[in-house]
Amino acid sequence: MLSRSKAKRKAHFEKTRTLLTEKIRESMISVLPIIAIVAVLCLFLVPMQPTLLLTFLVGALMIVVGLGLFSLGAERSMTIIGSKIGTALTKIGKLPVILLVAFALGVAVTVAEPDLQVLAATVPNIDKTVLLAAVGVGVGFFMVVCMLRILYGINLRWVLVACYIAVFLLAAFTDRDFLGIAFDSGGVTTGPMTVPFILALGVGISHVRSDKRAEADSFGLVALCSIGPILSVLLLGFFSDGGGGAAEITQVSFDSTTGIGTAFLQALPVYMKEMAMAMLPIVAIFLVFQVFVFKMNTRSFGKIAVGILYTYVGLVLFLAGVNVGFSSLGAELGAALATGETEWLLIPLAALLGWFIISAEPAVAVLEKQIEEVSAGAIPGGAIKVSLSVAIALAMALAMLRVVTGISILWFLVPGYAIALGLSFFVPDIYTAIAFDSGGVASGPMTATFMLQFMMGVSIARGGNVLTDAFGIVAMVAMMPLLSIQAVGVIYQRKAQRAAQELESYGDCDIIELWEEAA
């Protein structure tokens, strides 16, 4: 009996190790293009201090391991918690309880989102806690909207149209310093912490309904929840002063490798405390449900607890790696390229980085498979990958163009969203839901970390306004799947219709010829 128990533990350990290795490999594939391009730039175009480059590499290693641990932990804890709470709420069946819990969960999960933590720490002149609270409340409110939409079967397309009309009306009157931050907030909230949790919760709630549209209506939650932060930060702009976007690059230098080690060791306790506070609400909600509703056995509870621990450790490593290693080199590299003879490289380099970042993003493979399944194989995954790569490269190039020229982000977002919403009338609802849900796929951790810092470095070196020029890159990237996925859907739908018409026409001719022969 003892040997059997030992064998089970060993098998579980091996399975966990295999999964962790796979998650770390996926993280490495995401980060590797950035490391390679930065290495080439530092070796041949803009030499950097060796200690700064070493700090960047150590930070990259921490990001890879941190993202791997976080992904495994979120899969083993947050996704399961979301699914169980969704199922439990359907059994309770009381609308006020469902809406209250949905709001609380929206706030709790959002404030622990790693990409949002990075963005909030990067924004100058705006208190981090205030920004996190505003974004959390925005997501919480729209979680309530999502639940109502699922329960009452309201068409996603019209909800999106109404919400984006409200967004751009507010954007027309708010402080322009808040535009980029607001739209970036919408992009970073649909990250690796929030998305699995929200999707699992939505699927659980959709089981309340038994009609054919229930499963399809479980899509679109991420799309709507990303609108909440945009509206809440735009509203924040009416009551807060952006401070003119003044910022400067903090010169980071280390005398030796000992100094590098000290910097990371000093950062770790800070992020341990921050993430403990950030994860406390979601852990508290889970414990309340465990005591009064779930009542899981010790083994099941232990698995989720270990998953939460993985998530916590992963977040701490990720944030320390980003803020100590990635950020400083990204900003200095951008500033160095923005001055002198290398200035012409900025836009093509941004496009190149965009192409490789999305090509290496593991979540894109999941998206490709999802669209292939929904289209019954009519839309090949390769078409989605190429369209996304081109779209994100274009988004990065346009974002850099904004930094260089100071063009308002609204000149890109208003027509972009107008076209995206227009396309939604020409594709099946499920394509629209998947496209709007997929903004977070494109705006992955590398966009919110390295690329934002890179753009900020360029803006500061050119004497620009960081808030109006550099911020908005995540929003530009997050908008592209809305356009590319729906556009591919329209193209393939037209092809299918033409093929069906040709087949029908061919069949008609066949029948006529047969009758003529018989005569």
Give the label of every model feature segment.
Residues 30-45, 59-69, 101-108, 138-149, ...:
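Hydrophobic core segments of alpha-helical transmembrane domains in multi-pass membrane transport
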Residues 1-5, 146-161, 177, 181, ...:
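Juxtamembrane and boundary regions of transmembrane helices in multi-pass small-molecule transporters
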Residues 40-54, 74-82, 108-123, 142-153, ...:
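Transmembrane helix-loop junctions in multi-pass membrane proteins
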Residues 75-93, 118-124, 326-341, 363-379, ...:
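Flexible loop linkers connecting adjacent transmembrane helices
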Residues 53-58, 250-363:
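Transmembrane helical segments that form the transport core of multi-pass membrane transport proteins
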